[in-house]
Each structure stands twice: as structure tokens, then as C-alpha cells.
């Protein structure tokens, strides 16, 4: 179906024909733990990866399969793996690449959970990271070591929506025989497709824009199929005979889909962060309206950014659409149709003013999620990024007066009126 447009693909890929058993047009929820093999030979072929298909519910499910095919198609990859959460997706990617003493070069302005995983959790398993100013290519290159396994970035940094130069970073990674891993949660394949700019692995928290309604946890890993896992010798679990899977080389068995096949067959098999059929079904409902929702998110965001930029109680707006933003040129290059509905601004004052503003909003919900159809708000320094030291917070551009907004799809007049209420409360202090 590759000749179809995005809006058509988001509705049809993975279920081009009605369900063969029931003729259902909607994707069914296949609530089963296991699958019947025709005979012993068929079972052996499935376990040996010579016959593609369902083996056990921890690894695959037919509802999940539709979601995976759809996201892979939307991102322009060869295959995808859906798992229980975005955190699980990120962890599996980093485990697969970094095992046995690996090292990552990572953008320092990333989601706080990813930062903590790289800075504190993975070092306990012998995997380390160097955080860099991703906009300084010399600094990025100097951080690469002999045991570096990947460069890790986000299309839109969390929470300030800063933008890395994906093309340049892909070229640098490939110069050293490394894959570029891109978290495209905030970008979405509707606004940007990192694989077209040289990314090798794309990861999503599907909980956010892909699902879009704040109802469902999920994560997706997309394999571009373009990276040569055997060339450098750094990835034996993927390229060499794997002792935990009766000597199978995933490169030989799965070809361009080797990376996600390894994660499914080994890491997911052994640690079980499996997405449920119902969660996969709910995420598919979100994906079907992705383009429609994103158009409204982008439209509303432009108006909110304009409003905040002119407000006397706002010290600074951190949004790449603004001409004075340091990555404005990259925003125009990578996001010609707009983007960045999750961003921050700095209110005049400090924590007291920030909290007062947030506590007097009515439409905006104070919660930890983002990229919902409902508008959301949070104070990063005391919540999502509170595990960071003061120095780490400032290094990531998060100040005591920083407020993160996630602009929803409500009517723009109501969104702006709600922001007025917050500012009125601050003015009354």
C-alpha cells in the first residue's frame, strides 16, 4: 500500500481486507494467550523463525500485528514491535544495543525518564552514556568512544522542543559505523519521518500522540532496515549466532528486520513487557485520526505561542517556531507543516508564580502525560524532572519558573481564556 497517502495508510495498513474469520471491518481484539499449530513440523518452523506467524501471546498477537504494520508503514520502516509502554520500548532499544559494556552519546535535553534510565539505571548493568549539547557536532563527535553503540536523540526535545539536526547526526553516526536512534514521540510520523533523514531506529511512546486520548499505555520500536548490523562486529547478539535462540543469527533469519526481531525473540521473550490486545486496539483507534488531530494541535499551538509571546507576565517562550529560537532554521527544515505542541514558557517570577498560574487553570489538566486531545500543564522542576539536580535542570534548560504546556484540540478561544485566568491569579499576588 506504499503508493497511498498518509491519511489513507493510517486507516488501512495491516488490515487491507476485512477480518478473514468474521468479515469484520474493524480490527478485532484477539484476546488469546496462544495459537494452535497445524502439526509438529509447523510448530518447529514457527519457533525456528522460518515460518512467520504467531507463537505465543507474550511475543505476538494479531491485533498487535496490525498496529505494528501500520506504524512501520507510517514511519517508512520495514518492521515494528509494539510493547507495553514507551519506557519499555526505549529500554529494549538501549539494552539491545548497549549490552556487554556499551556506551551511548545522548542528547542532554531529553525526556526525564530517558535521562534517568541512561544516567542512573543502565550503569548498574554496565551500560554508560555521555550527555552532550546535541547542537554542537564537534562535542558530539568528541564524545564517541570505541565502545559507543549509538547516538540517541529526540526529534523535539522534552520539555523545551529543541530540534537536533537529524541529517548531520545521521551522517556522523554512520561515519563511525553507529546507528542513529530517534525518539519521534513528539514529532509523529505525520509531521516528520526520521528514517528519511538517516535515522536507523525510531522509537515512540504510543501513549502520547499515536494514541492521543490519554487512555492507553504503549510503545513502538520501528526498524528502518537500513543498518548493517554485521559490519562493525559491535552487535553480536543481532548478527552472530545467538546461543539463547539455538544459534540463530537474526541478520540471517530476519534480514532487514533483524533488530526488532531480536528484541521480540529474546528481550521481550525473557522480560515480557507485552502490549495487551486491548491496548493495541485502543492505540489503533488513535492512529486512525492522527493526521486530523495533529492539524488541530498545530493550529492551536501557533495561536498560543503568539499569545504568550506578547503577554507582559511571560519572560520567555521556548518554541522553535519563533524567529529568535536557536533552532528556528531547523524547525523550518524539518517541520514545514508546523509542530511542537508540547513546549515551555518562563513566567515572570519563580516557583510561587508558576504554581499559582497552574493551580488556577480549569481547562488545562495538571498531570504528567502530554500529547492528549485535552490541554495539559505541569511544572517540570518539581515533578517530571524533579529527580535531576539543580545543575542538571539548568543544563537542560529547566528553571524554577518554567511551565510546560501540552496544547490540546479544544476551541482556541477557550484555551486562551483559561490561560488568562492563570495570569490573572499571578497578577493578584
Which stretches of residues belong to each language-model region?
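N-terminal "arm"/small-domain region of PLP-dependent enzymes with the aminotransferase-like
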Residues: 2-61, 69-70
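Conserved N-terminal alpha-helix of the aminotransferase class I/II PLP-enzyme fold
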Residues: 39-91, 113-120
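Conserved PLP-enzyme active-site core in the AAT-like
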Residues: 2, 18, 80-311
Amino acid at each position: 500500500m506504499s503508493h497511498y497517502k498518509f491519511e489513507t495508510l493510517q486507516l488501512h495498513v495491516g488490515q487491507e481486507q476485512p477480518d478473514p474469520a468474521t468479515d469484520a471491518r474493524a480490527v478485532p481484539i484477539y484476546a488469546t494467550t496462544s495459537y494452535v499449530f497445524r502439526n509438529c513440523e509447523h510448530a518447529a518452523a514457527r519457533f525456528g523463525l522460518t515460518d512467520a506467524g504467531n507463537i505465543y501471546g507474550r511475543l505476538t498477537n494479531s491485533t498487535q500485528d496490525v498496529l505494528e504494520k501500520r506504524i512501520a508503514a507510517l514511519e517508512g520502516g520495514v518492521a515494528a514491535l509494539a510493547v507495553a509502554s514507551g519506557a519499555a520500548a526505549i529500554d529494549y532499544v538501549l539494552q539491545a544495543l548497549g549490552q556487554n559494556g556499551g556506551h551511548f552519546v545522548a542528547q542532554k535535553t531529553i525526556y526525564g525518564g530517558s535521562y534517568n534510565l541512561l544516567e542512573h539505571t543502565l550503569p548498574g548493568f554496565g551500560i554508560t552514556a555521555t550527555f552532550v549539547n546535541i547542537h554542537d557536532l564537534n562535542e558530539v563527535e568528541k564524545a564517541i568512544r570505541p565502545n559507543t553503540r549509538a547516538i540517541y536523540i529526540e526529534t523535539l526535545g522534552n520539555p523545551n522542543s529543541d530540534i537536533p539536526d537529524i541529517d548531520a547526526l545521521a551522517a556522523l553516526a554512520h561515519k563511525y559505523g553507529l546507528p542513529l536512534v530517534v525518539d519521534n514521540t513528539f514529532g509523529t510520523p505525520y509531521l516528520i519521518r526520521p528514517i528519511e533523514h538517516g535515522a536507523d531506529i525510531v522509537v515512540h511512546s504510543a501513549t502520547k500522540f499515536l494514541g492521543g486520548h490519554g487512555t492507553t499505555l504503549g510503545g513502538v520500536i520501528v526498524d528502518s532496515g537500513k543498518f548493517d548490523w554485521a559490519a562493525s562486529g559491535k552487535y553480536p547478539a543481532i548478527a552472530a549466532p545467538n546461543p539463547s535462540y539455538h544459534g540463530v543469527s537474526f541478520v540471517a533469519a530476519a534480514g532487514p528486520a533483524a533488530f526488532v526481531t531480536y528484541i521480540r525473540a529474546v528481550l521481550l521473550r525473557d522480560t515480557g513487557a507485552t502490549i495487551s490486545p486491548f491496548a493495541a486496539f485502543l492505540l489503533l483507534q488513535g492512529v486512525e485520526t492522527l493526521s486530523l488531530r495533529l492539524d488541530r494541535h498545530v493550529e492551536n499551538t501557533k495561536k498560543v505561542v503568539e499569545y504568550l509571546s506578547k503577554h507582559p507576565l511571560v519572560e520567555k517562550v521556548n518554541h522553535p517556531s519563533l524567529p529568535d529560537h536557536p533552532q528556528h532554521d531547523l524547525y523550518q527544515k524539518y517541520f514545514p507543516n508546523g509542530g511542537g505542541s508540547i513546549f515551555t514558557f518562563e513566567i515572570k517570577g519563580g516557583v510561587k508564580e508558576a504554581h499559582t498560574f497552574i493551580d488556577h487553570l480549569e481547562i488545562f489538566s495538571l498531570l504528567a502525560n502530554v500529547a492528549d486531545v485535552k490541554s495539559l500543564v505541569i511544572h517540570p522542576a518539581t515533578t517530571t524532572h524533579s529527580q535531576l539536580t539543580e545543575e542538571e535542570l539548568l543544563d537542560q534548560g529547566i528553571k524554577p519558573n518554567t511551565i510546560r504546556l501540552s496544547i490540546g484540540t479544544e476551541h482556541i478561544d477557550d484555551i486562551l481564556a483559561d490561560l488568562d485566568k492563570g495570569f490573572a491569579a499571578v497578577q493578584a499576588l
